[in-house]
Amino acid sequence: MARESGRKLIASNKKARHDYHIEDTYEAGIVLTGTEVKSLRAGRASLVDGFALIKDGEVWLQNVHIPEYAEGSWTNHEPRRPRKLLLHKREILRLLGKTRETGLTLVPLSLYFRDGKAKVELALARGKRAYDKRQALAERHAQREIARALGRRVKGHRM
């Protein structure tokens, strides 16, 4: 049987784009057990409260929920265990330098399979304040109104 190619999205963290200013993104491999892979292939995971830490020169994904595999036995995994991420050494050093700056953190944006291997899209992000969120919401609303007005004008409707 041929291996699947391309990118199959498993989970995305929509709340991260709302709560953080995304400065840079990285793709990292993830170390998983067998039942975790089977659970991911079933399309079950949650990145909502997830974050990454750099500890002893290694990047660890924390608080990401991959539920137990339904058909698993005593070999099942713990759903919220820390998982090691695979990055190049220079990427880890760059991230270490950037996360030492105040206010920057590592947040998972999406979890997917690429060419049969599980990957995580990590974002180097800065937290938004409440007024930033309100401003972004107002900008989106204004853009939607402009697009709606232009759509009416193009279709020939009068306001």
Curated annotation (Swiss-Prot):
A GO cellular-component term linked to this record: cytosol
Top-level taxonomic group: Bacteria
InterPro entries: SmpB, SsrA-bd_prot, SsrA-bd_prot_CS
Compartments in which it is found: Cytoplasm
Alphabetized UniProt keyword annotations: Cytoplasm, RNA-binding
Principal location class: cytoplasm
GO molecular function, one term: RNA binding
SUPFAM superfamilies with a match to the protein in the record: Small protein B (SmpB)
GO biological process, alphabetically ordered: trans-translation
HAMAP family: SmpB
Name used for this protein in its record: SsrA-binding protein
Source taxonomy: Bacteria, Bacillati, Actinomycetota, Actinomycetes, Acidothermales
